[in-house]
Swiss-Prot record:
GO terms for biological process: mRNA transport; nephron development; protein transport. Keywords: Membrane, mRNA transport, Nuclear pore complex, Nucleus, Protein transport, Translocation, Transport. Component of the nuclear pore complex (NPC). GO terms for cellular component: nuclear membrane; nuclear pore outer ring. This is Nuclear pore complex protein Nup85. InterPro entries: Nucleoporin_Nup85. Signal peptide: none annotated. Component of the nuclear pore complex (NPC) that seems to be required for NPC assembly and maintenance. Involved in nephrogenesis. The keyword Plastid does not apply. Disruption phenotype: Morpholino knockdown of nup85 results in abnormal pronephric development characterized by underdeveloped to completely absent pronephros. It comes from the Eukaryota.
Amino acid sequence: MEELDVDPAETPIPGLGQQNRHIGFSWGPGDLLLYETLYQKQGSETAARCPFMYLVRSDEDIYSPVLRKLFNESHSIFVGLQKSAEENAGKSRKAQLVQVSRNYRSVLRACMEEMHALSESTREPSQNTKYISQISILSAMELSWNLCEILFIESAPAGPLLILLLDWVRLHVCEVDNIVQDVLRSERPTEHEKFWDGVTGYVLQGRMNEARQLLAKEASSSVSARSMCRVLDDLLKKMPMLNTAGTQTLTEFELKWQHWREECERHLQNGTFSSNPHMEVVCRVLVGDEEVILEKRDLMTTWYHFLVSRLLFKHPTVKPTELHFYAQSSLDMFLAGNSSPEPLDNILLAAFEFDIHQVIKEFSIVSSNWWFVAHLTDLLDHCQLFQAHNLYFGANMREFLLLDYASGLFSHHSLWQLGVDYFDYCPNLGHVYLELHMERVPLNTEKKALKALRICEKRQMTEQVRSICKTMAMQSLCNGRLGSALSWSIRAKDAAFATLISDRFLKEYSERGNFTDLDLIDNLGSAMLLSDRLTFLGKYREFHRMYSQEQFSEAASLLLSLMTARIAPCSFWLTLLLDALPLLEQKQVIFSAEQTYELMRCLEDRMAAKLDSTSPDEIQKQDSVDSTKIEMLRLALARNLARAIVTEGALQE
């Protein structure tokens, strides 16, 4: 096993582990539950247990409202990228991948700006500190992502590479813009102490037009410096710059650049700017004097700005393969041994060395969540940069990081739905992970359960569908919602549970004399075949509907078939027989003699079954009401039998 690059971070938990007892724990998706057990450490004295349980979250970012927007919006970009990859397989997609990368960066920048606004509006110091920390992380993400976009996705060659790096520095180092704003707000800009810092700062970023505009203010306000300003302006104007259109070859550019540089050196040698130290400094920057450039580290603020400025004036046609040398030397020169590199410095150095695996590794160490590494790795995988890098347990790096990121989303009460799509696009282990996580989604509401159910049904996750339906059926049953419980048990195709709920419906009918949830029972359809008891419930309700519609003959036949089929619970037999009483008392004979004999047999079978299952002492205690009902039934059956025999005899004559 590889050794850890850094020691794991320690999280102190006040009050836990101070009573010399062993600590128990339970892992959750993104959470860790900690508690003190009954077991004491050896040699320790008996002490009271800590009465609290502690929930430790590994990723607090997921609960930030601003970062939730980042997760939501980047999800749609991710899904769009996967779909376009399927549609355009085999085609060159460089321009599209660059656009996708910019979309990700746009979302990052929007979140940063919103976080800035929150930081400025909040008055609570602790919350403000948290916002500043998150802004710092988001800024590092966008800075690193932008560099990876230039080096790995655009794969810019010598020449255009420097143009992109200049844009990168201008976007992320804005110190000079703040300086110039202060200068221009003053009454006399050219006399402002930071005026020449603004000119030099623009030059260091290759923004020659802006530098010339500031220089023009100096020329108009100082007659003595006007001629020098004109010479310096001419040098800035003449500085060769490669264009991204590629209309100029590198050889032509290098020739022009060499002539221009020689002209700058001549002016220095001739002492053109000797009377104005500020202009001389600018000219020394133009000829690539590294000592002078390094003296302006306060304007550049970062070593990577120094790197790009150094390349601009010394090696404008630097090749991608040479970047790592200049990057390392620029870092060493900028820090000058006064401080050690920060984690962000290591990430950028790894990028300049084109070691994308080290970039991912370094950012995984410093980041509090997997968003950056998961999405960047996925994007670079579409650039065919990870094909040869498989992890020891089978999954490639892209899938491993996406699985971890999606697992983290499942710990959130609403973001778990985003995690489903990430699992979908992990071909090796995604389906297995999704099955395990869907079983652990808390089904707090029926709406959430229906969402989870649709997800599982769409992906043919049969066991998870059954599990969700059973869970919701039990919740509904515990809450006394029999209709909902029956509906969920039918969806789960759980015959045993459907039988249990059907019995509850029948018990409720016996106690109240009517059914609840009639719409559900009336529309069971083929679902009633799930269990015998459910079939009985549906048919018994159909009998009541026929009776209410005065379809007495059909109702009588159905009632008799329900009794002879013996699918009703024993406790319900007397209720069925009593339901026959109104039909037996009709003026018109409903039950034939044969049907009446069947009813009599059912009554006697019921009595015999009751005698077999009841002790003699209990028989004596039987309620007289039941006895009265049975006597009424026997009398009604006898009368109906006599009427039926007479009627049938008359019909035969």
